[in-house]
């Protein structure tokens, strides 16, 4: 992912996305640079409109980000329901224990 981030950073700052610049960004970040991966990235991005790809990804990520809090809230509600059920079972078991002394 750091290779893609390097390319995105270069694009955002208006720098040319080439092997030398990608290597420089990665080295500045302290990452180990694999020349083959850098070359593959540059080749893969050759016909890609990065601006369009970033906008498309940002739009697709927005609904997913909005769904995350709802899913967390739902999981919390389920946990509360399970706790209530366990408490009810414990109370019922305690009541039965009193019957048999």
From Swiss-Prot:
Pfam families: Ribosomal_60s. GO terms for cellular component: ribonucleoprotein complex; ribosome. The keyword rRNA-binding does not apply. GO terms for biological process: translational elongation. Keywords: Ribonucleoprotein, Ribosomal protein. It comes from the Archaea. InterPro entries: P1/P2_N_sf, Ribosomal_P1/P2, Ribosomal_P1_arc. Residues 61-72 have a biased composition (Low complexity). One of its GO terms (molecular function) is structural constituent of ribosome. Residues 61-101 are annotated as: Disordered. The keyword Ribosomal protein applies. Transmembrane segments: none annotated. Residues 73-92 have a biased composition (Acidic residues). Belongs to the eukaryotic ribosomal protein P1/P2 family. Part of the 50S ribosomal subunit. Homodimer, it forms part of the ribosomal stalk which helps the ribosome interact with GTP-bound translation factors. Forms a heptameric uL10/P0(P1)2(P1)2(P1)2 complex, where uL10/P0 forms an elongated spine to which the P1 dimers bind in a sequential fashion. Forms part of the ribosomal stalk, playing a central role in the interaction of the ribosome with GTP-bound translation factors. NCBIfam families: ribo_P1_arch (TIGR03685). HAMAP family: Ribosomal_L12_arch. This is Large ribosomal subunit protein P1. It comes from Methanothermobacter thermautotrophicus (strain ATCC 29096 / DSM 1053 / JCM 10044 / NBRC 100330 / Delta H).
């Amino acid at each position: 992912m750091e290779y893609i981030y390097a390319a995105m950073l270069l694009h955002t700052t208006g720098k040319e996305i080439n092997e030398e610049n990608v290597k420089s960004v990665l080295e500045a970040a302290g990452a180990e640079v694999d020349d083959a991966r850098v070359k593959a990235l540059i080749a893969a991005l050759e016909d890609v409109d990065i601006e369009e790809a970033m906008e498309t990804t940002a739009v697709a990520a927005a609904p997913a980000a909005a769904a995350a809090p709802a899913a967390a809230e739902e999981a919390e509600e389920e946990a509360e329901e399970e706790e209530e059920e366990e408490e009810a079972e414990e109370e019922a078991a305690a009541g039965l224990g009193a019957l048999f002394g």
